[in-house]
């Protein structure tokens, strides 16, 4: 199978073809996703909650990410694999580069970091040293204590203008992808249209170039609060492989996320 690359996603954006992505944390699910053609995966620090059982993503370490990245890469050797740099792993550009090197050696193709314009120098340092970067704006879970909980971001003119400015700054610094989480559809549309790089949404409506879901949300195995943007594809299909195919089909057709999964 031909490897999926950042260029593959750039082509999707240019051709206005929506694409699906998903989190993965182990060999078996990564292999299954790849076999069904879901070839863009993220080893997210969400593993702190879904795999380790913590209340937030904050306890996750670089070593945790590297461990799961290695497992996912074994299962999906040709996927485009993103890996989160966890909380306090990129406080300085130098620290970011050292930790990015660890997860890249483990098998990642790209690192994802949360934050806006303050990360410009970090993004430049990484990209100049051959580490591709995916930005992450909106609801950035590592900032949960600043936000006072998991809340929609970017409402109001000032907040939306700031996020657009952040997105443009990250792109100018060299970021090649952007994740937008829990923002109003109208803002997601503005940002997606303003950027040349692909934008992946989660809780950002169906106007972004791609979508991502935490696999546990996609299969309805998340305990406790279920995010508004989540959909249990397994409940409708009764089969994990069929659920993966339905998720991909609904993203590609624009059916998912629907109005009921979106914010304004």
Swiss-Prot record:
Mg(2+) binds at residues 45, 84, 114. GO terms for biological process: pantothenate biosynthetic process. Keywords: Cytoplasm, Magnesium, Metal-binding, Pantothenate biosynthesis, Transferase. Its EC number is 2.1.2.11. Catalyzes the reversible reaction in which hydroxymethyl group from 5,10-methylenetetrahydrofolate is transferred onto alpha-ketoisovalerate to form ketopantoate. Homodecamer; pentamer of dimers. This is 3-methyl-2-oxobutanoate hydroxymethyltransferase. It comes from Escherichia coli O157:H7.
